Design a protein with these regions (language model features):
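C-terminal transcriptional activation/regulatory domains of eukaryotic transcription factors
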Residues: 1-20
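C-terminal effector modules of eukaryotic transcription factors
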Residues: 22-191
Length: 191
C-alpha cells in the first residue's frame, strides 16, 4: 500500500511543473504504460474484499486498506487524465474499474476510531441494502437537471474526492455524447 501511495506522489511530481516551469513537461509515453501495468497488477491483487461481496462489515483495518488502495488507483487514473488534458493525449479507459464501489462515504472515511466506525458502517450497510453504488454508475448518469435516486443518495454521503470523480465522469460522459462516440470513454479537449 505504501508503495502505491508513493507512486501517486511521484506521479504528481513527475507530471506537474515546478513553479519556475511555464508548462507541464512532456513525459515519455512508456511511463504511462508502466503506470497502467502497475494498476493492473494492483487490480489483480484485489480491489474488493470478500466481506464487501457478502455485504457484511469487514474489519476496520481491512476496510481502511482496501479503500485506500482503491483511492490510490483512482488517483493514478485522475492524474493521468489531467496530464492527458494538458497534453492532448488519450487517457486511460477507466471502465475496467466499473466493478469497484464508488469512493466511500465521507462519514466512514473520516472516522478515526474503530469503535466509532463499526456502528456507522453497520448503518451504512442497512441504508444501501447490500447494493452499494459502483464506479460504473457514474457513466450511467443521464444529462439534465435531475439525477437518479441512487446517485443522489451516494452524493449525500460523498466526500470531496468522490465529488471530483463524479464531476469528471459526468463531464467526460457529456463530451462523449456530444462527440457521438459509441466506444469507450474518449476525451477530446478543445483548447
Amino acid at each position: 500500500m505504501a508503495a502505491l501511495q508513493a507512486l501517486v506522489i511521484y506521479t504528481i511530481i513527475l507530471f506537474f511543473p515546478k513553479p519556475e516551469q511555464a508548462s507541464v513537461p512532456t513525459v515519455d509515453l512508456s511511463i504511462f504504460q508502466n503506470l497502467q501495468q502497475v494498476v493492473y497488477h494492483v487490480a489483480q491483487s484485489g480491489l474488493i474484499i470478500q466481506e464487501e461481496r457478502d455485504h457484511v462489515r469487514p474489519s476496520w483495518e481491512a476496510w481502511i486498506h482496501i479503500t485506500s488502495k482503491r483511492r490510490a488507483v483512482l488517483a493514478l487514473y485522475l492524474l493521468h487524465w489531467s496530464y492527458s488534458v494538458a497534453k492532448c493525449v488519450p487517457s486511460f479507459n477507466c471502465r475496467e474499474l466499473g466493478f469497484m464501489p464508488a469512493p466511500a462515504a465521507k462519514m466512514l472515511w473520516q472516522v478515526s476510531r474503530k469503535d466509532e466506525w463499526e456502528p456507522l458502517y453497520d448503518r451504512w450497510l442497512i441504508r444501501w441494502e447490500g447494493n452499494e453504488y459502483l464506479q460504473q454508475e457514474f457513466w450511467e448518469i443521464e444529462p439534465g437537471v435531475m439525477i437518479d435516486r441512487r446517485t443522489q443518495k451516494w452524493l449525500e454521503e460523498a466526500d470531496e474526492f468522490g465529488i471530483l470523480l463524479m464531476s469528471l465522469g459526468n463531464y467526460v460522459s457529456l463530451h462523449h455524447l456530444q462527440l457521438g462516440s459509441s466506444s469507450g470513454i474518449v476525451l477530446t479537449i478543445h483548447q
